[in-house]
Amino acid sequence: MNDKQLVAIEAAKLATNGMLIGLGTGSTANYFIEALAERQTKEGLNIQTVASSTISAIKAQNCGLALVAISQINQLDLYVDGADEITPKLSLLKGRGQDLVMEKLLATAAKQFVVVADKSKLVSRIGEKFVIPIEVMPNAWQMVKQQLEKHGGNGDIRLNASQDNVAISAQGNYILDMT
């Protein structure tokens, strides 16, 4: 069992009966979903979940977790997600998986936001290992990019996996990858 699995299992212990739980996106979030589903099965937990991405929703359904649409909630009891980078002051870089808006909405709606990560995510400053993703409306990406450049940012629009078109977020937006 790796460190990500161990921290995900610990995070799943925070779930209690009747909770509405937000599910993050990524490899560590997947371990959390599995651990949460295992607790539900073994302990008979009555919980509902809200997924931050289509891939997490599919994972949750495959694991037997009940899903609620974000449009049906006002607040979450708990939101658990991973991070791409974490500084000593607990600043986080998230969103390399293109689900920035949903992750931010769920984190903001949660009474408790728990980030599960192993030591490989620790950095001295945000942007040390990865570019900083910024989700923008398609009709405003150039304006946003210019404004960020005025403040010292540098970067460009993210391309899809085939490198032949613009990458589109789950919400239909573009992503600027900035340094």
Describe each model-derived feature in a short phrase.
Residues 2-6, 54-179:
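Conserved phosphate- and dinucleotide-binding cores of soluble alpha/beta proteins
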Residues 1-82:
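N-terminal active-site beta-alpha-beta segment that forms phosphate/nucleotide-binding
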